[in-house]
């Protein structure tokens, strides 16, 4: 399998690490104005996508040295998939509502689509067990409460009137994410052991 050879190549891993590191930094900078008005207790839960890429960056750093970090791997897989898909859908929804999308919207579609894909591509290398996925699942679902009960969700001014529908969609996206993460990791391990 040629793609696995590429995914394991140290040079490729280093480039991917640097892309994710700079993407994480850019992502936190993108959230700067929202973080400035966020109560301290919620700060860790507001910058969803940069936090997801941060988890993946940490995974890549350890993976470069042939180490596994299952809790980080579970958080990376679930958050990359969920927030990657979420941002793509929200930007397409913005395009539908407004009839137009600026260059940043298209950049977010491409970069967040890539986030979701990279999390899935590395699934065969994760050492995730049920306890690791349970922690990541709690993180995802707890984040829904923070976002949609306490109003800390990312600010998309043009979509504000659809917050209830977006919250409902996001909850089910989390459930789908947990299912996909299980099937790609624990489910595959069960197949190999059978």
Residue spans for each PLM region:
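Hydrophobic cores of alpha-helical transmembrane segments in multi-pass inner/ER membrane proteins
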Residues: 51-63, 113-124, 169-185
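Non-cytosolic membrane-interface motifs at loop->transmembrane helix junctions
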Residues: 38-45, 98-110, 157-166
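Terminal transmembrane helical module of multi-pass membrane proteins
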Residues: 127-194
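Alpha-helical transmembrane segments of multi-pass membrane proteins
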Residues: 17-34
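A glycine-rich, hydrophobic loop/mini-helix early in the fold
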Residues: 32-98
